[in-house]
Curated annotation (Swiss-Prot):
Its EC number is 1.4.1.3. It is an enzyme of class 1 (oxidoreductase). This is Glutamate dehydrogenase. Pfam families: ELFV_dehydrog (PF00208), ELFV_dehydrog_N (PF02812). It comes from Bacteroides thetaiotaomicron (strain ATCC 29148 / DSM 2079 / JCM 5827 / CCUG 10774 / NCTC 10582 / VPI-5482 / E50). The gene is gdhA. InterPro entries: Aminoacid_DH-like_N_sf, Glu/Leu/Phe/Val/Trp_DH, Glu/Leu/Phe/Val/Trp_DH_C, Glu/Leu/Phe/Val/Trp_DH_dimer, Glu/Leu/Phe/Val_DH_AS, Glu_DH, Glu_Leu_Phe_Val_DH, NAD(P)-bd_dom_sf. It comes from the Bacteria.
Amino acid sequence: MNAAKVLDDLKRRFPNEPEYHQAVEEVLSTIEEEYNKHPEFDKANLIERLCIPDRVFQFRVTWMDDKGNIQTNMGYRVQHNNAIGPYKGGIRFHASVNLSILKFLAFEQTFKNSLTTLPMGGGKGGSDFSPRGKSNAEVMRFVQAFMLELWRHIGPETDVPAGDIGVGGREVGFMFGMYKKLAHEFTGTFTGKGREFGGSLIRPEATGYGNIYFLMEMLKTKGTDLKGKVCLVSGSGNVAQYTIEKVIELGGKVVTCSDSDGYIYDPDGIDREKLDYIMELKNLYRGRIREYAEKYGCKYVEGAKPWGEKCDIALPSATQNELNGDHARQLVANGCIAVSEGANMPSTPEAVRVFQDAKILYAPGKAANAGGVSVSGLEMTQNSIKLSWSAEEVDEKLKSIMKNIHEACVQYGTEADGYVNYVKGANVAGFMKVAKAMMAQGIV
């Protein structure tokens, strides 16, 4: 495989999709050496087949707002690869959503799901609709209109969506309800469902918890843990909230939290009481993080990211490309020893190079934030066997999965000098499972 040629061909065939190109380039650059050990892969044109999605659905969503005006948004579902299981990946509702972002997320999801060892392929979907500022009735009407098209492309053995940015328990509930009505069946077609209708315990917490479990495995390789460590967290949604919760539980101190308007810096640390306030502010009142600064009298920086503050550990948990090369250099200069990604591809390629050149611990999202989709897979299992596991059972399975992912990364990513390149390890481990499955299934 010539990685540069493959990437040039993709850019020619799919122009104006920078996020997708970035994701493919990052994977190709790390798997090329391992790929070239298998000439049968080239003969089967495997890399091109793996980079291009199986299919992409793009559709108009028309709905009525509370004033009786007709609104139009775009809806998408990218079914990337189902070599090892049904397509699996979230639905994102945000004004920034476009095909490039969803293709990148579906591509990444394929390898992330492979790493979990559970039978799940990769997919992603969403819309440029934003729930922010919309009434509950408007969100429901939009979701129902969205499902009028999506429902025909999904199913428990075909494609199992879940939540993502802008899609929480409320939106998943509306989607599941509409699917149930249209398909006339009650099946595990969605994950992240409410506990009352087939959801799994620990699912809301899973991405944040899983990230910290992975971080703990990394820290063990350096003979340390979270106790007394100062952590920077970006975001204030589901992933950030439960990341903070687990850091507090394990003895660390989180001093930042953010949203799209800016970030707060609380040198005393976000404790349990303050975290409860953030959860209430964000989940119930849909408020802004600056209100935290007003309530607790701490620093609020508008229009900025938290990465200039001093810390031991950085946990980017907001969105893609939120942490650039300059941010990375600031973190390294300030003594940061580890970066573990709760969001999908939050670090730019330049930032990743800075971390790796400095030889600090750096965990890419496809490994570190795989806890969310892992517990989604466990929810699928519970739905299929019509049983419900306890929180303790699910949490133990999550810990085991994250430990196994870490071991796979170390196996494939350890370099000659002993430094673990977790990006390479995650990409090669995830790729090899999918590649072998595709080879075994013929040219399809």
